[in-house]
Amino acid sequence: MAKTSMVAKQQKKQKFQVREYTRCERCGRPHSVYRKFKLCRICFRELAYKGQIPGVRKASW
């Protein structure tokens, strides 16, 4: 889990647009966040395996 202070800091409107960055909405992780789902890779994987993300299936070929 991310520090509460860092999550609060990120939610404030930034003075410059360049300073904004994505965070996982579930755990607050700042790295490897999928923009489309607003989830980090770890949370995405957990929810995908449980079938809680509509339209996502395990790949097989």
From Swiss-Prot:
InterPro entries: Ribosomal_uS14, Ribosomal_uS14_bact, Ribosomal_uS14_CS, Ribosomal_uS14_sf. GO terms for molecular function: rRNA binding; structural constituent of ribosome; zinc ion binding. Keywords: Metal-binding, Ribonucleoprotein, Ribosomal protein, RNA-binding, rRNA-binding, Zinc. Its cofactor is Zn(2+). Part of the 30S ribosomal subunit. Contacts proteins S3 and S10. Belongs to the universal ribosomal protein uS14 family. Zinc-binding uS14 subfamily. HAMAP family: Ribosomal_uS14_2_B (MF_01364_B). GO terms for cellular component: small ribosomal subunit. Binds 1 zinc ion per subunit. PROSITE patterns: RIBOSOMAL_S14. Zn(2+) binds at residues 24, 27, 40, 43. This is Small ribosomal subunit protein uS14B. Binds 16S rRNA, required for the assembly of 30S particles and may also be responsible for determining the conformation of the 16S rRNA at the A site.
